[in-house]
């Protein structure tokens, strides 16, 4: 085992192996991966292997697109079959709001170059003849979507990484990580490794890895179950006749996915009441672990599946898998630099890890080698969460994020779990005046004020919500009279002392306010000249400046 290297990747699931592969592909071949047990032995091995391109986030959508494109080329590059079945994916819609959601998503897909098609119920029936389409409004299809064998994918990227010079140490547990003046020392039960960078890709062990360096990584897994059935004669007949596989089917309004598996079907619901697990982390000996199944939780979704695909109710159950999937409070992964630590990187919280692994490894390699990512990664930034994300908060929010996977994602949606966490001194007064609150960085902030008998509640919609009229009145009042703004939730800091002006002048692209008491709007740039943050800067004294920025960017900016 090496005692010195450039980068140590902690964790040998598909996410960690992808990070190693992409670092080597980027030319950084003096890199190693350490895995406490065997590759894929955490959550990768029991994943259903789906590769959904659908995502409302520009950041995550681009990670998924890159990954799907990469996986198609891996066998040619490495000689390893990854079991990628490009069978397409169909997402059904039974409601008008769901169709609105798909139309909004189509704009995201077009922007990032993902092929998506709208289907009529008759077209769905043609592709999926076992599907009951009588109550559908329509659907969307991703022709390039499908599923893959997670273990084979991981081994292919491991082979590719090794072929480029990277090394993998299995059965090597990390027992400590220490920061030095030049980098890091990763202590394992097989010896220590000195390195410049550490990447945490430890999945279910994310919080334990974080604690080694003083980080509270906001990840707690949630149980996810899926059912594998016995073979169905209609599916076997199709295979015998050489007909194509029907592909992945997602009934978003019944909140489940389904695909063919060995002549039968796989059903994976996202049910109410799925509990967080490994809240304090798995045991040190955890390996290839599953939980006791709970079919009672799945009963409504099983009924929905039988309604949509009657054949599902005509076969027996072969196996039920119930395993841990990592989650974050907003359901997006955490990919990028840690807060407060130099050259410690986080690649955790992947609830769709098989799909996102390729893209996350790609962007981390770009970030580490070249200093900046090549796409906007704000949607997966580790610093988008703060100290308010305690264990109890994470448990509640992560269960909510799991529950919302298939729910309609409205553009103005504010979720209800773990609310009233951080409130300003005038919170009660604003609430009594009709404030309808949203949450940013844990803070309750008024989105609008309900007036004239309006219900003090938001009505989420893809069209004109009631807040249009309320905000119209607010704007008119500010224009014609005066308005008050609660600044409590904004991020604030003070830069003062000798050299403060020179430091800020280097940091921002705009001119700093010259006179004491004057204010300027200034933009901080990253190393490639892109906009990192926006600050309102007030000059308090010749060598003192007061900075205000977006509340959601408190940890990112400071």
Describe the predicted segments one by one.
Residues 18, 177-292, 300-308, 392-414, ...:
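Flavin-dependent oxidoreductases
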Residues 382-558:
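Glycine/proline-enriched, intrinsically flexible loops and inter-domain linkers
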Residues 24-44:
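Glycine-rich FAD pyrophosphate-binding loop
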Residues 141-197:
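Helical element adjacent to the flavin cofactor pocket in flavoenzyme catalytic cores
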Residues 49-127, 246, 253-258, 262-266, ...:
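Dinucleotide-binding Rossmann-like beta1-alpha1 core, especially the glycine-rich loop
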Residues 4, 82-91, 125-164, 282-289, ...:
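Helix-loop-beta segment of a Rossmann-like dinucleotide-binding subdomain
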Residues 150, 253, 262, 284-422:
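C-terminal catalytic lobe of FAD-dependent flavoproteins
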Residues 2-15, 32:
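Beta1/beta-strand and adjacent pyrophosphate-binding region of the FAD-binding site
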